[in-house]
């Protein structure tokens, strides 16, 4: 399987085509996890770095490398890279202000992402290259208040309560993520 590897600036660094195993666990209400096992070749050592992005060619999902372990076996050196899927980016923010929402769950999620990731009051808190995607017009409604809680935990709670999943999608051509 080919895996495309991007740096933090979303530039394509190369294609990893030597993976012995790729485990890609999706979750509907939260970010999933992934694992990549490959021989520790020169190119693999260059491509497999913490915070780099792993994308499959047939999917809009992507993973963020969080841990890299180099293992020595009788067959040689191997790399084990693990991480979470793209929505885990949202764990890097808290809901900074007291927010009261009475709207559809979908709009509530979009509002939280917009106000805390895309266009926060404190510009330094913005995460670049994340935009809102297409509105799906789900009808489920919610009435809640949240403050100083992790954004990802808040979204996961809304998803589990309402039955509406979420994810960040990656568009490598535009170098953008869409919520």
Feature-to-residue mapping (PLM):
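Short beta-strand and beta-hairpin "edge-sheet" elements
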Residues: 53-84, 167-169
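Envelope-exposed proteins and targeting segments
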Residues: 32, 77-79, 175
């Amino acid at each position: 399987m080919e895996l495309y590897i991007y740096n933090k600036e979303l530039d394509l660094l190369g294609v990893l085509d030597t993976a012995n195993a790729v485990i890609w666990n999706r979750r509907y209400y939260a970010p999933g996890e992934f694992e990549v096992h490959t021989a520790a070749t020169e190119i693999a050592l260059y491509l497999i770095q913490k915070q780099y992005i792993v994308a499959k060619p047939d999917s809009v999902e992507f993973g963020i490398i969080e841990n890299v372990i180099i293992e020595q076996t009788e067959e040689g050196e191997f790399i084990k890279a693990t991480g979470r899927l793209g929505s885990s980016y949202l764990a890097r923010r808290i809901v900074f202000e007291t927010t009261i929402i009475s709207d559809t769950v979908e709009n509530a999620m979009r509002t939280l992402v917009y106000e805390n990731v895309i266009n926060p009051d404190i510009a330094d808190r913005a995460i670049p290259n994340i935009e809102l995607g297409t509105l799906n017009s789900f009808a489920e409604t919610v009435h809640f208040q949240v403050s100083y809680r992790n954004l990802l935990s808040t979204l996961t709670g809304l998803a589990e309560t309402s039955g509406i999943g979420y994810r960040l999608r990656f568009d490598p051509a535009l170098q953008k993520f869409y919520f």
